[in-house]
Amino acid sequence: LQIALQTKIKLFYRPAAIKTRPNEVWQDQLILNKVSGGYRIENPTPYYVTVIGLGGSEKQAEEGEFETVMLSPRSEQTVNRNYNTPYLSYINDYGGRPVLSFICNGSRCSVKKEK
């Protein structure tokens, strides 16, 4: 009997100059720009963001097929998905998988702020 396991662990160091406060959600600064055939995800923050889902509903963002995207600080990446009301799922600092809801105004979509 032979069992093989493969595990990936990502470790990031945050310099003191960009440390966050506990429970601070900075991922809500992400911006989706509509482009031909999909979205360009823009990360204006000084942090890495791992996007694990993009869908037309919260459930689709959580469970749908999506190739994970790692966004570097102050970078952008294009994904070939197109939805009227996009939802984005990411991995937070605690391993959780929150979902962000976006509101689009023209070709620019920003996170819908919770009240």
Curated annotation (Swiss-Prot):
InterPro entries: Ig-like_fold, Periplasmic_pilus_chap, Pili_assmbl_chap_C_dom_sf, Pili_assmbl_chaperone_C. Mediates assembly of pili by forming soluble multimeric complexes with pili subunits as an intermediate step in the assembly process. Its main location: periplasm. Keywords: Chaperone, Fimbrium biogenesis, Immunoglobulin domain, Periplasm. This is Chaperone protein PrsD. Gene3D superfamilies: Immunoglobulins. It comes from the Bacteria. It is found in: Periplasm. GO terms for cellular component: periplasmic space. It holds the Pfam family PapD_C.
